[in-house]
Amino acid sequence: MLRRVTVAAVCATRRKLCEAGRELAALWGIETRGRCEDSAAARPFPILAMPGRNKAKSTCSCPDLQPNGQDLGENSRVARLGADESEEEGRRGSLSNAGDPEIVKSPSDPKQYRYIKLQNGLQALLISDLSNMEGKTGNTTDDEEEEEVEEEEEDDDEDSGAEIEDDDEEGFDDEDEFDDEHDDDLDTEDNELEELEERAEARKKTTEKQSAAALCVGVGSFADPDDLPGLAHFLEHMVFMGSLKYPDENGFDAFLKKHGGSDNASTDCERTVFQFDVQRKYFKEALDRWAQFFIHPLMIRDAIDREVEAVDSEYQLARPSDANRKEMLFGSLARPGHPMGKFFWGNAETLKHEPRKNNIDTHARLREFWMRYYSSHYMTLVVQSKETLDTLEKWVTEIFSQIPNNGLPRPNFGHLTDPFDTPAFNKLYRVVPIRKIHALTITWALPPQQQHYRVKPLHYISWLVGHEGKGSILSFLRKKCWALALFGGNGETGFEQNSTYSVFSISITLTDEGYEHFYEVAYTVFQYLKMLQKLGPEKRIFEEIRKIEDNEFHYQEQTDPVEYVENMCENMQLYPLQDILTGDQLLFEYKPEVIGEALNQLVPQKANLVLLSGANEGKCDLKEKWFGTQYSIEDIENSWAELWNSNFELNPDLHLPAENKYIATDFTLKAFDCPETEYPVKIVNTPQGCLWYKKDNKFKIPKAYIRFHLISPLIQKSAANVVLFDIFVNILTHNLAEPAYEADVAQLEYKLVAGEHGLIIRVKGFNHKLPLLFQLIIDYLAEFNSTPAVFTMITEQLKKTYFNILIKPETLAKDVRLLILEYARWSMIDKYQALMDGLSLESLLSFVKEFKSQLFVEGLVQGNVTSTESMDFLKYVVDKLNFKPLEQEMPVQFQVVELPSGHHLCKVKALNKGDANSEVTVYYQSGTRSLREYTLMELLVMHMEEPCFDFLRTKQTLGYHVYPTCRNTSGILGFSVTVGTQATKYNSEVVDKKIEEFLSSFEEKIENLTEEAFNTQVTALIKLKECEDTHLGEEVDRNWNEVVTQQYLFDRLAHEIEALKSFSKSDLVNWFKAHRGPGSKMLSVHVVGYGKYELEEDGTPSSEDSNSSCEVMQLTYLPTSPLLADCIIPITDIRAFTTTLNLLPYHKIVK
C-alpha cells in the first residue's frame, strides 16, 4: 500500500495512517508512522517517530527555506507600520480582506490568504476564514464573539489533555505517540466506536476552528552539537517554561486550557515546529504570549533540571518501539560525522549526567543555541482566524517584529550528500524486534528529491510498488501466502527526506512461511522494479494519479486549523509562494526523465535489507547504543547476490495495473427527494433492520458516508467466538484487498471492524462510484470463504497481533481495567488463550454461517445521496445476506459491576521484560448518571487538566504522559487520572500516592475557585460544544456514535450546553467531594515495568536488560507494598473479585 495524505494530514505531529491501510498495517504488524487521511501524495513505509514536546511527536522534514534558498516572496511586500500602510492600501484597494491572487487554492476553499515578510525577515502567511459569517467583516465586538457560533475540530493530543472516553466503545485509547504499533488492535476490538468517541469527544477539548497559529524554525536536530546530543529537542521543550514578559513556568499552557486551547511542538532534523489553537476572543493575547518563546524565554536553571526528566521519559517511552529502534539503527549506518547518525532524542545521560561529568554548562549552551538558531529570518509563521487579513497583518506585525534577527546564515547540510554510500549499507541486517513480527524492509538512499516536487517521482513509483491489485507485488506474494501487507515510498519526514538524501523503502509483513523465503520475497520486489525500469515511466499511470489527486484537491474538505497551519508553516519552508497550498499534493508536470532517474537507482546492488523476526534471537551479537536493539550484519548469500547481479528474468505474473474503473467523473450535487432535516431521520424500520438518513445541504460536496452495523448475539457467547469473529473479519478484509484496491486509491475508502457486538462497515468518498464499492463488500461478505492456507496465515498473524497488544503497558492496563468493570467481557488474554488452544477452518465457516443467518442491521447514510438511493443500500444488504431477524432486542453494551466502597488495587507485572514503562490509572466510579451529571463531569475534568499536568509532570516529573479522563463505561460514569512512568525512576505505588496528593490539592483548588474563573471555564466548554463542524465527516461521526450505541440523541450537544448554563461552582465542588468522600468507589490499576524501583515476586529488584517478552500470556499479580497496604484492598484474582459484586443495570445517558 502506498502512503497518501491530504493537506492537513501532512502535518508533522499528526502521524495518522490512511484509514484504508491502518487496520491492515496494525494487524500485520507494519510499523507505520503515516500522516495520511483521505489522500494525495504517496507516503511510504516507515514514517518514524521523532522527538516532540509533550503531546505529539516531531517529524523530520526538509531543510532550506526554499528549494533554491530564496525567500517565498521575491516580488512580495514587506509588512510595514504607520504611513507605509497606505501603500498597501493602494496595492489592494480598499478591501480589508483581499488575498494574494498568486497563491493557488482549491475552488472549495472559502479562506483568503496573504503573504507578508516582516522587517526582521520573518515570513508569514495570513489566513482569514470568514465563512459562515453571514456577511460580517472586520472586527466583531466582544459581545458578538461571545454569541458567535464557532468552529472546532478534533485533536489527538492525549498525553496531557483531558480525555473523554467511552470505555465500552474504546479500543485502546491512549495512543502512544512513539508506538507505531498503537493500532495493532484495530481489527480485534471495537475501535470503530473508540474512534468515534475519541473524535467526537476530543472536539470538546480543542479550540475554535478559526484561531490557530504555527511557527516553523528552519533549524532542527542536525544542528545539535556533538557533545550535547538532543539539545535542539530539549530547547523546543524549554521555551515553553516561562518568558520575561510572562514568567509563570506553566503560564502559556494554563492560559490555553482556561480558554479551551491546546498547544504542541515537534523537533525535526532540519526544522522545529510550534503550534497552538485557542478561542478566537483570546487569539491576539495568545499570540503575544506564544511569541515570547522566540523573543525572550527565561529557561531558568531549576526548570532545566526538571524538564530534562520529561525529555528522558519521552525517550524511555520511545525505546520499546520497533520503528524507533529501526530508525536509530538505520541512522547508525551513515558515514562517520554525518548528522544522520546523531541521537536526536536526547535523554538524562546526554543532557544532564555526561555534561556534568565533562564540566559542560547545559544552561549556558542552551541559551547559546537559542540565540544562534532561533533567528527570525529562519522562521515561517502561519496564523488562521475569523478576522480580516488586515487585522491579522496588524497583529502579526505588531507582535512578531520583536523576534530578534542575528543576521547569521542558517546551517546548511546540503553538501553532505550520499550519507549511506558506505560498504556497510548493501548488506543484510537481521534484527530482533520487541513485538512478534516477521518483516522485510528494503531501502535505497537516493539523492535529495525535494526539488522535484512538481513531478513527485517517488510518489509515482510508490503508487505502483504499493499497488495491491492484479499484477502487483503484494498480490503475487499473497497468493503464495508469503506476505500480508506491503507499504512503499517515502514518508517525507526529515529523517527520510532532507537536504542530504531521500529514502525509498519497501516494507513487507511476512508470514511464517514468507520469513523462510525472504530472499525470494526480495527477488520478487527486484523483478517488479526491473519490469518498471524496462517499461519506463507510463504517461497513462501518471495521468491517472494526477486526475485522482486533482479531484480530491478540487473538492477538498476543510480541516482542523491547528493541523492546517502546522502543515502550511512547513510548506513555506519548501515551496514557492504560488505552491504553498498545493506543493505537497498535486502532480504538476510529467517528466519521464526525472521519474526514470529515480527509478533506475532502485537496483539490488544499492539496496539495504533489514529482516525483523523473533527467530533472529541468538543470532544477533551486536547492540545499537541508544535503544539497545540486537542485530547482526551479513553479506547477501552468494547465490542470491550472483542472481541479482545478473540479467535476471522478469516475472510474467507482475505487470502494471489496469485502468481504474472507480475514478469519479460525475460531481453533480443531487436535489432533495424528501423534506430537509437538521438531524438524521429513520426512513426504514423493519424487524431485520433500520436506516437513518440525512441529506447534506451544508458542505455541498459530491461525497457520501455509509455506515452499517450488523449486530449478532453470537459474538460474545464465548472467547472462542470472539476470536472466530476476529479471524472472519480479517479474512474478509484479506479477500477484499485486491478487488477493492482500485476503489481505495480512487478516494473511495472502506473499513471493516470487528466490533464488540457486530460487524461494522464504513464506506466513504465521491458518491458517483461509491455504490460499486459497497456492493463489492456485501458480495464478498455474502459469499465468504477461505482456503486452509489463508486461514492458517491469518490465525498465525492474529496470535502475533494479540501478543503485541498485550506487551504494551497502556493497552494491558486498559484490558485489566475493563475486565474488572465490564461483566462477561472477554479479555485479550482470554482471546489469546482461545487462539492458542486451536481453532479450525471448519469451526470458522460454521460460525460465519450462523452469524449471517440471524442479524439486526442498522445503518446511517449521509451526504450527497437521495433517500431512495440510501434505502437501496439497506435493501442490498438484506437481499444479499437473506437473514432472519433476531428473536429479541439485543443491547449493544456490557453490564458493569458496581465497585464496593473503598480503594481497590490491581497490580500486575508488564509482559515485556525489556520495557521499563509502567502505567498507573486511578479510577473513581460514579454510577448510572444523567446527561446533566455527565456534562458536570466533563467540566470537572476540564478544570483538572492543567493543574494535573503542572503538578504530576512539570513539578513532580513523574512521567511524560499525564492526563485526567472522563470515562463512560457502558453508560456508567467515572473519571480517572493516568500517569505513564518508568520503573527505572519510580515505584508505581509512589506514583499512586502522588496522584492522591494531587487530587487532595485539587479539591482545595476548586473550593477556592473564584466565580469569575468558574464562569470562564464554563463559557470555554460551551464555546467548544457550540462549534460548527469543519467538514461532513465530523457531523457523520457524531451522528453515527448515537446510532451505533442506540442512544439516538442527535442533539446531545444542545442538551449539554443547556446543562452547562445551569451549573454553579457549588455543583462542581459538591460533585467532586461526593466522589472523593468516605463512600467513594476507587480502583487503581498498575501495570508495572521492569527496573530498579520495582520488585520481582521474590522481592528482588527487577531488571529491564532483557529483550524478551513473556511467552505465556497470563496476569502475574503483585503484592502491595507497605506504602499502600494500610489503605487499599488488593485484587489478586479478577474473576474471584468480580463474581461477588452486584451488577448495575443497563444504562444509556440520554436524559
UniProtKB/Swiss-Prot annotation:
Its cofactor is Zn(2+). Gene3D superfamilies: Metalloenzyme, LuxS/M16 peptidase-like. GO terms for molecular function: endopeptidase activator activity; epidermal growth factor binding; metal ion binding; metalloendopeptidase activity. Residues 1-20 form the signal peptide. Keywords: Cell projection, Hydrolase, Metal-binding, Metalloprotease, Mitochondrion, Phosphoprotein, Protease, Signal, Zinc. Its EC number is 3.4.24.61. One of its GO terms (biological process) is positive regulation of myelination. GO terms for cellular component: cell surface; cytosol; dendrite; mitochondrial matrix. Residues 141-198 have a biased composition (Acidic residues). The modification Phosphoserine is found at S86, S94, S96. It is an enzyme of class 3 (hydrolase). It catalyses: Hydrolysis of polypeptides, preferably at -Xaa-|-Arg-Lys-, and less commonly at -Arg-|-Arg-Xaa-, in which Xaa is not Arg or Lys. It is found in: Mitochondrion; Cell projection, Dendrite. Transmembrane segments: none annotated. Residues 53-108, 133-207 are annotated as: Disordered. Zn(2+) binds at H233, H237, E314. Binds 1 zinc ion per subunit. Primarily in adult heart, skeletal muscle, and testis and at much lower levels in other tissues. The active site is at E236. Interacts with BACE1 and NRG1. Belongs to the peptidase M16 family. Cleaves peptide substrates on the N-terminus of arginine residues in dibasic pairs. Is a critical activator of BACE1- and ADAM17-mediated pro-neuregulin ectodomain shedding, involved in the positive regulation of axonal maturation and myelination. Required for proper functioning of 2-oxoglutarate dehydrogenase (OGDH). This is Nardilysin. It comes from Homo sapiens. The lineage of its organism: Eukaryota, Metazoa, Chordata, Craniata, Vertebrata.
